[in-house]
């Protein structure tokens, strides 16, 4: 734990003593809660601004990246990832699959248009086109996370799932804190739709599934928080005591 008293600070580290067999060495801020996970082999420090009287608690995880597999049907697929990818660039992730057509696309709800994707982020939904005649298995090494937060603007947005099915109507797992007027409703819980590539049709859903992307409608600016049951998450990683 770091006690700041409103002062900024910089957290530095060295992982030279950790055996190379552990390809996952990550750090995450658990208080205040955030979904951001940082690869400690890729960077050696984090900086935090001053002016906020906030105590920080960090969790360090040592283990191995898990492989998450997307099963992609021929045609357009609406997908998401369940964690922080080792390599976020779609061009690198899809390099061994010539039948996957770049770019991937996300939806910009403020511009009302699709945008090409340069990095995959947990919590976002993406359109991906496969020209293969059968199911393509796209394997993505990543750090599993059990929650994410993201801003949702009014209108339709593309969101994603986590490592296990989540009841979208359960306010303990899915919260949509309004930004601005707290009396205004935000996300409509019955507006969750996923895409069925085999049927070429949308299907209304009440659950967020792993690897799937979904359309959802919000009436207001809000902060969406989605949380999975951490007890049921299976991971070969070892969480060290919080510091």
Question: PLM features: residue spans?
Answer:
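N-terminal exported-region signature
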Residues: 1-25, 30-44, 48-243
């Amino acid at each position: 734990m770091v006690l700041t008293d409103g002062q900024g600070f910089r957290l530095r580290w060295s992982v030279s003593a950790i055996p190379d067999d552990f390809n996952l060495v990550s750090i995450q801020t658990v208080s205040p809660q955030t979904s951001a996970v940082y690869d400690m082999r890729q960077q050696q420090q984090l900086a935090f601004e001053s002016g906020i009287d906030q105590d920080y608690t960090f969790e360090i995880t040592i283990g191995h990246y898990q492989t998450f597999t997307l099963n992609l049907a021929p045609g357009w697929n609406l997908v998401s990832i369940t964690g922080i990818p080792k390599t976020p660039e779609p061009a690198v992730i899809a390099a061994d699959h010539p039948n996957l057509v770049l770019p991937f696309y996300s939806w910009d709800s403020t511009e009302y248009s699709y945008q090409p994707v340069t990095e995959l982020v947990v919590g976002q939904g993406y359109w991906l086109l496969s020209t293969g005649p059968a199911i393509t298995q796209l394997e993505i090494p990543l750090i599993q996370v059990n929650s994410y937060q993201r801003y949702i603007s009014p209108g339709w947005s593309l969101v994603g799932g986590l490592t296990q099915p989540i009841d979208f109507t359960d306010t303990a797992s899915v919260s949509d804190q309004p930004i601005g007027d707290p009396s205004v409703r935000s996300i409509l819980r019955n507006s969750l739709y996923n895409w069925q590539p085999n049927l070429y049709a949308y299907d209304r859903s009440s659950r967020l599934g792993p690897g799937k992307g979904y359309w959802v409608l919000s009436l207001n600016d809000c902060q969406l928080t989605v949380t999975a049951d951490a007890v049921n998450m299976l991971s070969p990683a070892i969480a060290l005591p919080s510091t």
